[in-house]
Amino acid sequence: IAIPVEPPITEYLHAKAARQGIPLSGTFELTPLCNMNCRMCYVRMSREQQEAIRPLRTAAQWLELGRQAKEQGLLYLLLTGGEPFLRPDFREILAGLHQMGLLISINSNGTLIDESVVRWLKETPPVRINITLYGASDETYGRLCRNPQGFTQVTRAIRLLGEAGITVKLNCSLTPHNAADLEGIFAFAKEEGLLVQATSYMFPPLRRDPSQVGCNDRFTPQEAAYYAARIESLLNGEEAFLERLKSQSWEGLCADPGEDCGTLEGEGIRCRAGKCSFWVTWEGRLLPCGMLPDQGADVFQVGFAEAWRQAREAAAGIRLPAK
């Protein structure tokens, strides 16, 4: 088991796109609705909460946005939510975007994927489905996700996808509610021959409820560091982990892969956000990154090209604090 690394061609294309301001990769957040209710989620809403803000964007709107983004250079597209498979028109959206030649990945909790879903996924297969594994038992799913059948549902989905030849990558969001399952999650991944990418850091729920920052279901900094080291040990083996500690090769030990954030005060951001990647929220705001609480332009109103221009400008103006 190892943390997946992007192919060199993907890194090269993103580096070139960043220099030229081309939106090579993006995310469409199709819905804030989800059939689960995870304690640490930053975006989930009930249907009533969502409708009070605005109706969901239609399949036709998302497909038109895909066409506009492709004209500007989009190639790698992630479809996420909420839970995208909860949308009755998700098949239509996926098929339309697939026909445009985009390389599509899907984020899902996996619990809604059954035989009928797998059959139509095989017709327009995504490059990969990223399934978050929240525990190694139904009990943990009940405690963290409020779905007491979740583990049974997702493991069945993972096996169905594997039998259909659809690539699956496992993600693991570690919290105080499922930390005891960490070894079990890695054991399951090994048994299924799957990659697993785990993190002990949860973004604060700025978009869902800013008042909960610092109060939500996350580790303390000390706990997050401990579990980051534990994850490193499980990924590379305890012997290699101990050798690394002895050699004092700490660089990157607790950092997420691909994360390259500078620490000098006043320095600009180094990641791809607003340089060659973007995120469109379910309401239609185009942001440099989905974790930013900024408003962003309404991409369905001003069009993709203008919304992307504004996102690039916003990202270029971000400066890092000293701490």
Briefly describe each language-model feature range:
Residues 1-16, 20-22, 261-272, 283-323:
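Flexible mid-to-C-terminal extensions adjoining Fe-S/redox cofactors in radical SAM and related proteins
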Residues 1-128, 227-230:
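Conserved alpha-helical substructure of the radical SAM core
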Residues 25, 274-275:
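Short coil/loop residues immediately preceding or within conserved phosphate-binding loops
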Residues 32, 281-282:
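Short, ordered coil/turn segments that flank beta-strands lining enzyme active or ligand-binding pockets
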Residues 84, 112, 174-177, 294:
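Short histidine/acidic/glycine/proline-rich micro-motifs that form metal-
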Residues 122, 132-134, 139-270, 282-287, ...:
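Radical SAM enzyme [4Fe-4S]-AdoMet core and its adjacent flexible, acidic
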